[in-house]
Design a protein with these regions (language model features):
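Short acidic/polar alpha-helix capping motifs at helix-coil junctions
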Residues: 2-6, 15-16, 93
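Short, well-ordered beta-strand segments in beta-rich or mixed alpha/beta enzyme
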Residues: 2-9, 40-68
Length: 97
């Protein structure tokens, strides 16, 4: 299993809305692809302007097989649903043994 780890920065007062829109747009879009195993949302009370997403993939090849144009289309859809500033400020990849 491979973990895609993303740290998102968003205004604290918009954090809950961001999580809700992500669950509506991104999670179903990723779930359509082979290898998607699930997704977790982690929140740290010390950093109310940050959201951590833990996305579980069966293999890196399956994760990387998602076409860039598909990801761009989902990004556009998300930005229409959530038209506020947000940014991926850190990303990591982990292999689970």
């Amino acid at each position: 299993m491979v973990i895609e780890w993303l740290k998102i920065q968003v205004a604290p007062e918009l954090r809950e809305e961001f999580i809700q829109k992500d669950a509506i747009v991104w999670t179903p879009a990723l779930a359509k692809w082979d290898g998607f195993l699930g997704k977790e949302v982690w929140l740290d009370r010390q950093f109310p302007d940050q959201i951590i997403f833990i996305i579980h993939w069966q293999t890196k090849a399956q994760w990387q097989a998602i076409p860039e144009d598909y990801l761009a289309a989902i990004t556009r859809e998300f930005n229409q649903q959530f038209p506020y500033p947000s940014e991926i400020i850190e990303s990591q990849e982990y292999q689970v043994y």
